[in-house]
A protein has these predicted regions:
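Intrinsically disordered, low-complexity non-transmembrane regions of multi-pass membrane transporters
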Residues: 1, 29-30, 85-113, 245-247
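Structural signature of hydrophobic alpha-helical transmembrane segments
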Residues: 2-15, 66-73, 135-147, 190-204, ...
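Alpha-helical transmembrane segments in multi-pass membrane proteins
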Residues: 8-16, 20, 24, 40-41, ...
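Cytoplasmic-side transmembrane-helix entry/capping segments in multi-pass membrane proteins
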Residues: 31-41, 95-97, 166-175, 222-229
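A generic, lipid-embedded transmembrane alpha helix
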Residues: 39-55
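Helix-loop-helix junctions within the multi-pass membrane cores of secondary transporters/permeases
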Residues: 99, 108-187
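Membrane-helix boundary connector in multi-pass membrane proteins
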Residues: 211-222
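Juxtamembrane boundary at the C-terminal end of a transmembrane helix
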Residues: 235-247
């Protein structure tokens, strides 16, 4: 069944968030900071590992790099597009709208929970590659594995950030579901290299999210989201400008 992985993912986040909300009521305030930092450290290593797996190469016993210029161009151009569209502010506005209608009074971290969880659950390599596998091959295995991880993460997020994590199922459904459906139409042009490049950019964004979690910084990761899909643009442009294919 096409899209099964995304449906399972939505279900595990709903269950995990519910468990986290129940735990939140009995979780001392001093635990929250440590829980978030622990989740941030885990996220950090996931992001670094995903990036290095695509950037580093080993040939004839020597370590080299690949796709570094492409990565720089995607992030720079993606930032320009994202800032022009003001994606993160739109996410926050949507979260604030839902907070005003559905959140309990005093739930001051509702928007933060929605934005942080949505970005983490959507920008990673597993979301991209898993959704593509589901669409191309009808294989939801990777998305189901991601669903389990997201379920655990949603427990921790909800325990610290509250009910806003529930709302992350909306971007999960449309983002992963959209990639799955899109994969059916762009199947002839997708290559392992292209998928790897998209995953690499996504892993860098995961690392950026980890900095927000650990240091409570304000990197606007949402405005970098277009960067994930720019390797597709460079792939098609390389047909007319072969030099781009060497980035």
């Amino acid at each position: 069944m096409i899209g099964l992985g995304t449906i399972v993912n939505v279900g595990t986040v709903l269950i995990g968030t519910t468990i986290g909300i129940l735990l939140k009521n009995g979780l001392p305030k001093r635990f929250e900071k440590t829980v978030m930092q622990g989740l941030g450290l885990t996220t950090c290593f996931i992001g670094i590992g995903g990036t290095l797996s695509e950037v580093l190469t080993i040939q004839n016993g020597e370590i080299g790099t690949q796709h570094t210029m492409l990565l720089i161009l995607c992030l720079a151009l993606g930032a320009v597009i994202g800032e022009a569209l003001n994606i993160e502010q739109r996410l926050e506005d949507f979260g604030a709208f839902c907070q005003s209608h559905f959140a309990a009074k005093g739930d001051s971290r509702f928007v933060e929970g929605f934005v942080t969880a949505s970005l983490l659950f959507c920008v990673g390599a597993m979301a991209i590659v898993g959704a593509l596998n589901d669409g191309l091959n009808g294989d939801p295995t990777m998305l189901i594995a991601k669903a389990i991880l997201d379920g655990v993460a949603s427990i921790l997020f909800a325990a610290s950030l509250g009910k806003g994590v529930y709302l992350s199922i909306v971007p999960i459904f449309f983002y992963q579901g959209g990639i799955t459906l899109m994969a059916r139409f762009i199947r002839p042009w997708l290559t392992d290299v292209l998928i790897g490049q998209m995953s690499c950019v996504g892993s860098v964004l995961i690392f950026a999210i980890s900095l927000n979690l650990i240091f409570n910084s304000k990197l606007r990761v949402g405005n970098l989201l277009p960067a994930i899909f720019l390797p597709v643009l460079f792939f098609f442009l390389a047909r007319f400008f072969p030099t781009l294919g060497t980035l």
